[in-house]
């Protein structure tokens, strides 16, 4: 049985009780007024009122009570009918309430100290504090930047945010995708000056890169599966859906071989060079199903020692394939790993210097230099990002209780060109709590949709900030115009009719208009940008002026003497510093002569 809310039933009707009591006094006044007819009583009504209101006690005369109840019911009925037929007016908001944001709108989201903020525009910033005093102003630090070629994505947004490296309250590490290698040259000195460790992964020129070995971050069987998934996802080329069988077969073989390398090979051999050697040694004879190549013999020996070994189980599934099928699988694997036939790439991945799992421990700037015209080696960059996210999330959970001590910001320029980061739609939704943020820089939103398909909307939805720097891609403009909404404007029409007499007419009306239409967005001023922050009105603001940043004077853009010399840095990075920790081993090179 539904419980009656007594409080809700009584409180709204209290005013009508007072009306009823007042009506009893008025009825009493009319009844006590001298006179035998209505006109006489009306003339003497004041006498009746004085008599009736001499006492504030309500009249309980039957006639007066009936009049009071009738008056209360009548007024309640009028109020009910009025409310039922009431029209809802929103003056000047009839067709929409869209407007541009103001300084008061952004104020709750800004930290008073300039260095403790993410730079969004010239006038808008967002605090780096993930847990502000007022929880309703908490926003994740994921940012989507969209701008056509030449709109200033690097100069007006990426570089200013990279120079936000002086905060002691919210220390930050950076992972920067550097398409042409000019960002590290421009800002490397400023970062070093503020205590940052510089690390460089260069797929454009392997000789100007530190070493990166994905095998160095394998610690368990699930890490092997993650590495294989990333490798497959970013070296698939233009494969069709019909290739699914071969992909699964390759996955089995990669998993088995990498598992063997990780658990059985010496540390110095745990790299892609060893994987290539394994595949090259896997000879298959279609006319001899019982033939065993050297890799078969190695797995047979391992199976005798450890029959339940992870690699043995995976290899056993692969060996279910017939000779001709196995040969096709090996050819497919060889084609996929063809880039590792390049000696420089094998040397690059021979061992690891990047220490990706330490970016959340201390202030570090990792620059990932890549080609913006050739994506041959971009799978290596995507693999690096995938391992980076996984390693940092695991370390945050297992070591630091869920939050890294140093926030890690990934500034991914040319995000559509680095390849697909597996499960990015899930990562952007969960990395916030671990003090990790992801900033995607695109030329058009269609790039993201082409790469991530249906997951693109999920990725965009988890970006609390989005900035439009200008562009002409129709899909992006249409979506932005719809997101900005409509405002209500005043319109008037004038008319003139001529005949025997000339008459004029003037008509005023309200209309709805997009805050900015598609054609207006297409011709947006080159110095302007549009910022959208979740829960706040959009802002039409100036792009940030890099020359106004306090650290601009330490960049190569200001003075070429501050250019960061990559070759010199890489040639000197192995020199010991006074505070470096080293291990010393004593070796006896001159033992006692053998008798």
Can you say where each PLM-predicted feature lies in the sequence?
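N-terminal short leaders/motifs
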Residues: 114-131, 306-324, 482, 489, ...
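P-loop NTPase motor domains
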Residues: 9, 21-28, 133-436, 451, ...
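Short, surface-exposed polybasic-aromatic patches that bind anionic ligands, especially phosphate groups
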Residues: 545
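Basic- and hydrophobic-enriched, low-structure N-terminal and domain-boundary segments
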Residues: 1-151, 155-163, 168-170, 486, ...
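Low-complexity, polar-biased intrinsically disordered regions enriched in Pro/Ser/Thr/Gly
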Residues: 126-132, 236-245, 267, 490-509
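Conserved ATP-driven motor cores of ASCE-family P-loop NTPases powering translocation/secretion/packaging/pilus
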Residues: 428-530
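Mixed-charge, polar/low-complexity N-terminal
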Residues: 124-125, 130-131, 137, 347-348, ...
């Amino acid at each position: 049985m539904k419980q009656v809310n007594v409080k809700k039933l009584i409180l709204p009707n209290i005013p009508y009780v007072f009306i009823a009591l007042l009506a009893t006094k008025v009825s009493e006044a009319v009844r006590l007024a001298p006179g035998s007819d209505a006109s006489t009583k009306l003339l003497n009504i004041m006498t009746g009122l004085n008599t009736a209101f001499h006492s504030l006690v309500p009249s309980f005369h039957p006639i007066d009570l009936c009049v009071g109840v009738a008056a209360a019911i009548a007024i309640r009925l009028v109020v009910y009918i009025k409310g039922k037929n009431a029209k809802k007016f929103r003056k000047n908001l009839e067709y929409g309430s869209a407007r541009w944001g103001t300084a008061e709108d952004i104020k709750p989201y800004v930290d008073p100290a300039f260095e403790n903020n993410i730079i969004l525009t010239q006038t808008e910033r967002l605090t780096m504090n993930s847990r502000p005093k007022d929880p309703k102003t908490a926003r994740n630090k994921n940012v989507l930047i969209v701008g056509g070629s030449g709109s200033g994505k690097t100069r007006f947004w990426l570089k200013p945010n990279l120079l936000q490296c002086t905060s002691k309250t919210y220390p930050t590490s950076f992972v920067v995708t550097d398409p042409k290698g000019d960002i590290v040259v421009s800002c490397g000195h400023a970062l070093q000056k503020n205590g940052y460790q510089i690390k460089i992964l260069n797929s454009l020129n392997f000789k100007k890169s530190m070493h990166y070995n994905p095998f160095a971050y394998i610690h368990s069987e699930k890490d092997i599966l993650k590495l294989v998934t990333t490798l497959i996802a970013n070296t698939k080329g233009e494969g069709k859906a019909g290739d699914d069988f071969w992909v699964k077969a390759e996955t089995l073989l990669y998993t088995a071989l990498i598992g063997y390398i990780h658990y059985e090979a010496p540390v110095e051999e745990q790299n892609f060079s060893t994987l290539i050697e394994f595949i090259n040694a896997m000879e298959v004879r279609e006319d001899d199903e019982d033939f065993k190549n050297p890799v078969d013999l190695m797995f047979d020996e391992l199976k005798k020692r450890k029959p339940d070994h992870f690699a043995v189980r995976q290899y056993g599934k692969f060996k279910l394939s017939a000779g001709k099928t196995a040969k096709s699988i090996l050819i497919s694997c060889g084609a996929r790993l063809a880039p590792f036939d390049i000696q420089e790439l094998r040397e690059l991945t021979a061992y690891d210097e990047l220490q990706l799992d330490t970016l959340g421990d201390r202030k570090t700037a990792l620059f990932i230099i890549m080609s913006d015209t050739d994506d041959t080696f971009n799978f290596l960059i995507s693999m690096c990002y995938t391992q980076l996210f996984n390693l940092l999330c695991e370390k945050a959970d297992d070591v630091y209780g869920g939050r890294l001590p140093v926030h890690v910001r990934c500034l991914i320029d040319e995000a559509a060109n680095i390849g697909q980061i597996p499960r990015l739609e899930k990562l952007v939704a969960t990395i916030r709590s671990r003090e990790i943020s992801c900033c995607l820089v695109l030329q058009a939103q269609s790039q993201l949709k082409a790469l991530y398909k249906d997951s693109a909307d999920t990725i965009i939805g988890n970006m609390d900030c989005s900035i439009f720097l200008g562009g002409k891609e129709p899909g992006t403009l249409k979506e932005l115009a719809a997101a900005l909404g409509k405002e209500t404007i005043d319109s008037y029409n004038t008319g003139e009719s001529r005949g025997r007499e000339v008459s004029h007419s003037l008509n005023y009306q309200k209309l709805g208009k997009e805050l900015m239409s598609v054609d207006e967005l297409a011709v947006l001023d080159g110095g302007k940008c549009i910022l959208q922050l979740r829960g706040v009105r959009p802002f039409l603001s100036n792009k940030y002026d890099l020359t106004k940043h306090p650290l601009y004077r330490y960049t190569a853009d200001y003075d070429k003497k501050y250019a960061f010399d990559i070759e010199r840095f890489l040639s000197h990075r192995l020199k010991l510093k006074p505070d470096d920790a080293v291990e010393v081993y004593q070796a006896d090179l001159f033992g006692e002569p053998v008798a």
